[in-house]
Amino acid sequence: RLSAALLKALPYRAALTAAWCSAAFTFHVCRFRRRETLRRIREVFGPDYPARDARRIAWLSLRNMSFNLVEMIRAQDIDRAWIDRHIPAFALYVPQVQALIRRYGGAVITVPHMGNWDLAGWACNQYGIRMFSIAGKQKNPLVNDWVNRQRETGMAILERGSGTLKQIIKLLRSGNALAILP
């Protein structure tokens, strides 16, 4: 909570710098789960994949996750002006999404797993598009509750499970948009 309060109090770029420093320390000094991460990257790309490239993917992934955490912590303060300043092209696509929702009663938006996809939900919320998504449960219940509280600042989160499909259909029929990672 203290770290979250600090990251929220700092100016945005300073908070990102602090997140970068924390990620760099974790990756380069502590090497937390680094061996396992590199093993998994090589499993996907093959044993001949250059070690340098695998390290780069691992580093960028951790760095970007740290940046996403900063945005998640600051989600309650994200307003339309912030969205327009940091994601200038976003407003161009809002009318298209709104038209699809009016025409079909709901929408499914596929989002690549790049960057902070939760930010898409917060941004849509600022433009009046009601979003929801599906998430798995985190192992630590305190972390799970915190992450869901942060995410639900801009969109509803459905926990993956047996009744999820019925909830999805109900929300889509009521004019919501589902953000999903294909």
Which role fits each region the language model picked out?
Residues 76-182:
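Soluble catalytic domains of membrane acyltransferases
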